[in-house]
């Protein structure tokens, strides 16, 4: 049977047929629709019970709001239910005019963005207005479980009270000084961050892509000053399928035509190798290791579709880099900070990268904060005037980032991610029809990042689930 509770007000006071369209949201970004005809019957004051005109035994309890859980044919799905028409006869009224099913307030906001904003994104037709923990609400008050987590930027949950409290308290005191002066927050953040991750120094920036750029500048500088590479000859290796941003340096390292097409000329000194292929890395290091200063890699590739390398991959990469005196840069912007069941995803292979790039959840999603971690040999190659940011290391960001790291530690969110990750993969596997392909790929043994390969030959598979990630709270 199917039971949906939708609020307090009755759907209709008439007694006839009602045509309903159910918008079903599985664990993906894609929708399917079921249209059914039901007859209305009085049940008790304030409620109406609808039964189908067909022989299928389905019961709907429909007084008004919207979201709940649907149990049908043994499959649990998140669902939205809204009458597409209310009838005083057997003839349905006209369907809603909005092609995306948006309310007038939501449509107005979407149109404003479309009319005045750049068209560099194609969002889903949902206009969010509020968030708390694992849930978000749209402008019409409907709630959703957030399975995207702002690309892992809200690992601590939306609007975590401790992080928001730190933001509000510091915002009333001092927000920005620039690095022309010391401030009373940067030193404390630097101490906490370096102690937490076990590095000599941290260089704070604003966004993940700035962190990546910073790591590359450090690597090149180290290559010239420490390794002794001839000036302007330093090379950096990347993995194919990488994604770390959309600046010119980032797209220069990309092999995605959508990312780099039409933006040349590109940054020199960048080369890419197959991901999770130590043999390819070994061959390139043996061929030209004297000119290679760094290999930058994601422990698990996110944008490429949650691509998980074999166990031991990073350990083998680290050994090769040490053998050829090449820095290992781990891009932990998306995989770090508890998302994969450990502080850093590289911890799964017991690897300590030479340079670590952090971002996204470093602020719990309340403002942009990024950081680069390294030891003295690498970090101290950059001197005053050679790198910086007006907002990097500002008091507001430092207080927020410290609070965000404290939440990760105090609430044991990395450990919780292991438990939630197992639950998520088990649930997705339970939803998958028997005999079909599309097993969920878990990010390591326990993690809250999961990818699903969908069978394109089956109905709905052409859209499928690209990447499903679950909060660690």
Range-by-range predicted roles:
Residues 37, 53-94:
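N-terminal mitochondrial targeting presequence
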Residues 88-473:
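Conserved N-terminal phosphate-binding loop of PLP-dependent enzymes in the Aspartate aminotransferase
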Residues 5, 9-16, 21-23, 28, ...:
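Low-acidity, Ser/Thr- and Arg-rich intrinsically disordered low-complexity segments
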Residues 23, 39-42:
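Compositionally biased, intrinsically disordered low-complexity segments enriched in Pro/Arg/Gln/His
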Residues 1-2, 11-12, 40:
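Ser/Thr/Pro/Gly-rich low-complexity, intrinsically disordered segments
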Residues 32-34:
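Intrinsically disordered, low-complexity terminal segments enriched in Ser/Thr
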